[in-house]
Amino acid sequence: MKKINDLENLAKSYRRDLFEKFLLIKQGHPGSIFSMMDIVVTMYHGGFVRFDDKKKSFIYKVLISKGHATAALYPILKDFGVLSRKEWNNWGQTESLLRVFGNNSIPGIDITSGSLGHCIGAGSGMAVSYKRTNKDKKVFVIISEGELYEGSTWEALLFAKHNNLNNLTIVIDINSLIILGKTKDCLNLDPIKDKINGLGIKTYEVDGHNLNNLVTTFNESNKSNEVNCILANTIKGKGSSIMENKKNWHYWNQMTEEEIEQTRKELA
């Protein structure tokens, strides 16, 4: 596992690298990607997603249910050698495998996603299979809080609890915004923790941008012998004052030269 300071620097560098890519390809979902960056850096570089160095592949599965933010994994996969540097450099070209929405033809991406509300169900199926075949594998599923509007999400949570899927960890990226605006204004989901606890699922709450607290929380959930759900409170567009907490930065937007330089300085 890397030191906390190293994790923080990696998260910042990945945001910076992705920002430059978005400038180049003029598309993407920076708000949602930046909100979950500290989470995925903790998972991968914190050693919670087991990696086979010889095969250059991950033993544990990670499903990004908020498929529009899958690109958060691209620089991580590149650094682990799962995704080639050539493929990273080709992102935005017609022949590139990399897209705004991830798909499982990309090395290291375990599921094609984008239509919301499906990955807890898919991850639960994987987790059941691993338990029945006695495989020492874990499944992580990252969803957006907006997916709590989907009935399929709650059905899958009930299924996971019923089958005691202690090899499944669900992470909810709570950045308080969806395309339409603030979740509390569109359809208030609070108290999320009480609702999920009410299903009998072990629930943790953490600042999704505090790397030290994230490491502690993932360590605690790792020791648990039941289904885990981590509620990570985040800021949409984290790292850029121009994007933070702004619904219009769900998608990529045009920037002035001054805004570009300001964002570069903030991500430096």
Feature locations, PLM:
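Short, active-site-adjacent cap segments at secondary-structure transitions
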Residues: 71, 148-149, 177-178, 236-240
